[in-house]
Amino acid sequence: MPNEPIYHAHLKDFYAQLTRMLQGECDFSAAGVALYTTDASNYRQVPLGVVYPHTVDDLVNTATLCKTFSLPVLLRGGGTSQNGQGVNEAVVVDCSRYLTRVLDIDVENQTALVDPGVICDALKQH
């Protein structure tokens, strides 16, 4: 198709390599990406695919592979952005499914070490 970005030609190769190296899951189906076309804003963009990493290595491997294929990457949180940051024509990485641990809370220094999928409500419970 003439209007498709050039990186779409490499998407099948990217998907094949990604599924071989990923411990987590990924979904590049129309139904799977449809859930990530919107956030709390009025913007609508169809992602290239969605990755659900299980580990930090999954994050690193996904980012490295995206760089190799010159694919844009979007790390998505809760999809609550009202300015469109959570939607883009990119490989969306959703950490909210598996990377949700609160690893350490240091009350004295007012810091917390958390996985990237932790939401504020979960942190407040600790």
Where is each model-derived feature located?
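Noncatalytic alpha-helical scaffold of FAD-dependent oxidoreductases
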Residues: M1-H126
